[in-house]
Amino acid sequence: MEESPPKQKSNTKVTQHEGQQDLNTTRHMNVELKHRPKLERHLKLGMIPVVYMKQGEEILYPAQSLREENLIQNFTSLLLLQKLCPKDPENMVRKSWASCVPEEGGHMINIQDLFGPNIGTQKEPQLVIIEGAAGIGKSTLARLVKRAWKEGQLYRDHFQHVFFFSCRELAQCKKLSLAELIAQGQEVPTAPINQILSHPEKLLFILDGIDEPAWVLADQNPELCLHWSQRQPVHTLLGSLLGKSIFPEAFFLLTTRTTALQKFIPSLPMPCQVEVLGFSGIERENYFYKYFANQRHAITAFMMVESNPVLLTLCEVPWVCWLVCTCLKKQMEQGRVLSLKSQTTTALCLKYLSLTIPDKHRRTQVKALCSLAAEGIWKRRTLFSESDLCKQGLDEDAVATFLKTGVLQKQASSLSYSFAHLCLQEFFAAISCILEDSEERHGNMEMDRIVETLVERYGRQNLFEAPTVRFLFGLLGKEGVKGMEKLFSCSLHGKTNLKLLWHILVKSQPHQPPCLGLLHCLYENQDMELLTHVMHDLQGTIVPGPNDIAHTVLQTNVKHLVVQTDMELMVATFCIQFYCHVRTLQLNMEKQQGYALISPRMVLYRWTPITNASWEILFYNLKFTRNLEGLDLSGNSLRYSVVQSLCNTLRYPGCQLKTLWLVKCGLTSRHCSLLASVLSAHSSLTELYLQLNDLGDDGVRMLCEGLRNPVCNLSILWLDLYSLSAQVITELRTLEEKNPKLYIRSIWMPHMMVPTENMDEEAILTTFKQQRQEPGDKPMEILGTEEDFWGPTGPVATELVDRVRNLYRVQLPMAGSYHCPSTGLHFVVTRAVTIEIEFCAWSQFLDKTPLQQSHMVVGPLFDIKAEQGAVTAVYLPHFVSLKDTEASTFDFKVAHFQEHGMVLETPDRVKPGYTVLKNPSFSPMGVVLRIIPAARHFIPITSITLIYYRLNLEEVTLHLYLVPNDCTIQKAIDDEEMKFQFVRINKPPPVDNLFIGSRYIVSGSENLEITPKELELCYRSSKEFQLFSEIYVGNMGSEIKLQIKNKKHMKLIWEALLKPEFKFDHLCDQEFCTILKNIMISPAGDLRPALPRIAQALKDAPSLLHFMDQHREQLVARVTSVDPLLDKLHGLVLNEESYEAVRAENTNQDKMRKLFNLSRSWSRACKDLFYQALKETHPHLVMDLFEKSGGVSLGS
C-alpha cells in the first residue's frame, strides 16, 4: 500500500505520531485487510486527508491542490434542512412537545440551494439564516460559501462580491464606515468602492455568529441616507443594512444558534431558515480519515467509536467529533490503550482536559482559565487581550501550555486570544460556576445569583438550549462531580450541587414547556433520581388547546415530539423511559399517517431519513426500558439488519417491552427467523402485530416453531390469515388448542357482503317509480326518486332547502318505517313528523378532537333535526363489511358533536350496512369504529366505483373513482363533476371487500389513455378533493372494457363494459344541446332520459355558449399569469406567430384581449383546449366562475 504523502504545514501544529510502535500490530493488520477496498479507493482518488487550521476555525480537506479539488463535493457533507416559511416571524423557534400532530418541518437541501426558491413562498430569499446547535458546523459552512464562490464553484453568476465577517471580531470595532466595513470583509481589495456599490443586487454579506455579541442591531435612521465614507457605530451600520434602509437589494447570509433574532434585530425581514443538522453517517467516518494522517490510526479510532452506538451518535456534531478524535489521538501519543467510554459531551470534555492539561496547571491556572471563560460568556466576549489573561492570574507558562495543547488560540490579525471553540469556552464557564459556588458557600443567595446571571445571558425561554447550562447539568451529575474532583483534587458538596440544579429548574420551568433542550440537560446529567422526578412533573405542564373539545384525558394521552437528528433521537428515547405517563413509544416517518394506539404514548416524528445508525441508537436505549412497555414501528420499512438489531435488543435481559407493532414494515419470510428466535428466548414480549407484511407460509411456519417453545410468553399474535394456505391456518389453530393462553387474531378478513334479504325494515328497493310532484314552496327543488324515503304509502319526496349547505327536508306523513336507498338513512317514527337532514363533513369536527388517533370514520356524518320523541329509532349507515348478520356493538360507536364537546354513544344494534340507535337525540352524528394499533389498513370495507362521462361532441373523457360507500362523498363528487359537465354512469360496485390504504391498478382496452394508472383507496372527507383516474377515449366507435386489479396480488376486483349508443359527430351545437337536455347515463352504460336535476341545471344555464365565451370579461380581468397559459396552448392552438403576438402585449389584460381576438376563428375543440389549460393554470378561478354561474357551462 502506498504511503500517505507528508502533511503540509498549518498555522497550528498538529503533532505527528510517526514511528511510534503500533498499539497492536495484529489488530492493525486485520483492520487494514477489512478496510483495504476503502483505502485503495481513497488513495486512487487522492483523498489523503490533511487537517488545516485557520484562525481558530478547523477547515478540513484532502491534500490535493486547490486548483484540482472540488470544494462542493468535499464540504457539502453537512445535513441541511430548509424549513417551511413561518407565518409569524416571532414564532421562529424550535417546537416543544405537544398534544397535536406537528406540521411537516421542511426538506433536505444542498448548499447550492441556499438562495433557491423557498419551499413556503416559492420566492428566492434575500436573507438566509443558518441556524443550528452549538458546534454543529455553521461557521464552517459560512466560510465554505465564501471560499467556494471565490473558486468559481458556487453562486458565481449570482454575486459579484461576497464579504465575510466574523461578528465576534466585528464587535471589537467601535465605529466603521461602510467603506471600511467592506474592506474588512475582503481578503484583498477586488475593486474600487464606487464600483462595488454600483450594483447592490450583486452583493452578498455573510455575518457569522450574528447572535454572539451583546448588541441590538436596530435601524435607528431608516430614512437617513448616509455617505459610504461616514463612520457610525458598528451595530447601527449593521442594523441599517439588515433593515434594508441601506442597499435594500443586497443579499445576506447569517449564522446563529438561536432563531429568536427579532429580539436584537427588530427590523429583520422574513428570512429563509436553514438548519444544520450535523454529519451524515458516512461523513462521520470520513472525518476520521481527514483528521488522522496515519490511515491505520484512522481505522483503529473509528472502529473503536463505531462499536459504541452512543459515541458514534455524539460524533454527529462536528465539534464533538473533533473532541473524540483529539482524545483518541492523545491516547495514541501517550501510548495508552484506546478507551473512551464517555456517554455525554460533558464527560468527553472532562476526558479532554485530563489528557491535554498537565497536572501542575490544573488547580490554579485552569481555575483562572475558567474565570476568564465565564467573564467572556456573561459579557458576550470571545476575544481576549493579554491584559485580560493577566487580570485573571494566567501566567506566561500556563498560556504557552494552553496554546500548545490547543485549548487557546492566538489570533494573528488582532494579537488577541480565544478558546479553540466557543463550546469549549462555555464548558470552562460552567466549571467556573460550580467552583465559585463551592468556594463561596453562600447558600441560596449565591445560587440565585448564578441562575439570574444565566437567565440574563440566555433568557428564560432559551435557558435549556444554552451549552453552558447543559454543561452545568452534566458537571453536577454523579459522574461529572467525580470527574471534577479527580481533575482539580478538590471535594464538591453533592447536596449543594443538587440545589443549584433545582434552582435552575425552578427558575425556568414555569416559563417554558417541556422541550428537547430540557431533555438534553437531563441526558447530560444521567442521574436516575433527577430524571425520574423531573419527567414525572412534566405531566402537569401539558394542557389542551383552547379549541380542543374532547376530554382532557384524551389530550394528555398522546405527546408528539419532532426529532430531526440521531442525537435528538438518542436524547429523547433515553429520557422518555423515565416518563411514567408514557407506556408506548411510536416512531413516525415524514408524511406517514400515524397508527393509533390505545396506551399513553409518545410519538416521535422524523422528517429526515432514518439510517442504520438511527436504529442502532434507538435499540441501544431500549435495552433498559424501565416504564416503556410498547414499541410501534409500523409503517417504517425495516431492513434485515435493522430487524436483527431489534431482536438482539428484545433478547436483552433488561428489555421489558411487552407489545411490539411491526405493521406494514416490509417484512418477509426472511425476517421471521429472527422474530422466531425472540419468541424462543426468555423475552417479555406478550403481543406481536405483523399485519400487512408478506410473510408467506414459510415465514409463518418459522413463527410457529418459536411459538411451540415452552419459554415463549406470547399471548396475542396478529396475522393476515387470508393470504395463507389452509394447511398453515390449520397449524395455527392447532397451536391455539394446545396453548390456551395463545390467541392468534385476524378478525378482519376478506369475505363476501352478506345480503339483507328477508329484513322488512331494511329491504332495499331495486326499482324506481315515477316521481310525484309534491305541493310546497316554489324555491324548493324536488329531488329524483333515488333520494326519496320509501314508507308504508310509497315514496315520500325529499326537498332540497339549501344547495350550499346540502340541507334537505322530508315530511313523513304518518307513523311507520321509512328508508332512503341513496343515503342509507332509515327512520322509525310514531307520528307524522318533519325531519331536516344536512350532509356534513367530518373534517369540520375531527380536527378539533383526538378522535382520529383511536377511532376510524366508517360512515357519513349527518346533522339531523326532528321533533323530540317523534323518532323512536334511527338507522345510521356504515361501510364496514361484517361477516355476521349481527355484530358486536363493542367496537362501534356513534359520535355526537355537541356544543360542550364530543360524546361517543354505543349503538343498540350493529348489522351489515348500518347501526341502530333507539330513542335517539340528534346532533351532527356518524358512525366510528374503535381501532387497535395499525388496524386501520386491514379493516374490510364496502366500496363503490363511480364513472363520469363528459358531455362533449368531439371526444370521450371518463373520470373513474374508487371510494368507500359513503353517500356524502358520492354527493360531493357528483356536484364537483357536474360543474365540469360530467354525468355519472351507474355500474355495480366491486364484488370483494377492499382495504383502506391498498393500491389498485386501473386498466382497459387498447388505445385508452389512463392517468394515473394507480389509485389508492382512502377515506377523505367530503370537503376534500377525491382521487380519481382520468380516461381519455377519443372517438368512442366501439365498446370499451375497464378493469381494476389489486396491485399486490393483481387480482381482478372490478370490471365494466361501456357501449356507445349515440354518435354526435354530425350534429351542430343547437342539436347537441337539445339532446343534452334529455340524456343521462343509465345503469347499463347506455343513454336514457335525464333526471330532473340535470335537465333543470341545463335550463338555468345563462346561454348555450362555451365557457370561454360566457366568462370573457371575468377572464380578461382576473387571469393573473398569462404566459404559463400560452405555453400550454403553443403548438396546439397557437402557432409561433400568434404566440409571440400575444406575448408582445404589455399587460396581462392586453394579452388576454389579444387572445380572445384570435379565438374568434377557433373551433369548439380549440376552445376546449383553452379551457383545459386554464383549468390547470388557474383552477381556483375556474371553480369560482362555475359556482357563480350556477355550476354549469357548456362545451367545457
Curated annotation (Swiss-Prot):
This is NACHT, LRR and PYD domains-containing protein 1b allele 5. SMART domains: LRR_RI (SM00368). Keywords: ATP-binding, Cytoplasm, Hydrolase, Immunity, Inflammasome, Inflammatory response, Innate immunity, Leucine-rich repeat, Necrosis, Nucleotide-binding, Protease, Repeat, Ubl conjugation. GO terms for molecular function: ATP binding; peptidase activity. Residues 1-22 are annotated as: Disordered. The record marks F922, S923 as: Cleavage. Signal peptide: none annotated. Acts as the sensor component of the Nlrp1b inflammasome, which mediates inflammasome activation in response to various pathogen-associated signals, leading to subsequent pyroptosis. Inflammasomes are supramolecular complexes that assemble in the cytosol in response to pathogens and other damage-associated signals and play critical roles in innate immunity and inflammation. LRR repeats lie at residues 627-647, 684-704. Belongs to the NLRP family. Residues 126-435 form the NACHT domain. The record marks H896 as: Trigger for autolytic processing. Activated by cleavage by B.anthracis lethal toxin (LT) endopeptidase. Cleavage by LT promotes ubiquitination and degradation of the N-terminal part, releasing the cleaved C-terminal part of the protein (NACHT, LRR and PYD domains-containing protein 1b, C-terminus), which polymerizes and forms the Nlrp1b inflammasome. Nlrp1b inflammasome is inhibited by DPP8 and DPP9, which sequester the C-terminal fragment of Nlrp1b (NACHT, LRR and PYD domains-containing protein 1b, C-terminus) in a ternary complex, thereby preventing Nlrp1b oligomerization and activation. PROSITE patterns: CARD, FIIND, NACHT. The record marks K44, L45 as: Probable cleavage. Residues 1106-1189 form the CARD domain. Residues 789-922 are annotated as: ZU5. It is found in: Cytoplasm, Cytosol. The CARD domain is involved in the interaction with CASP1 and CASP4/CASP11. The leucine-rich repeat (LRR) domain may be involved in autoinhibition in the absence of activating signal, possibly through intramolecular interaction with the NACHT domain.
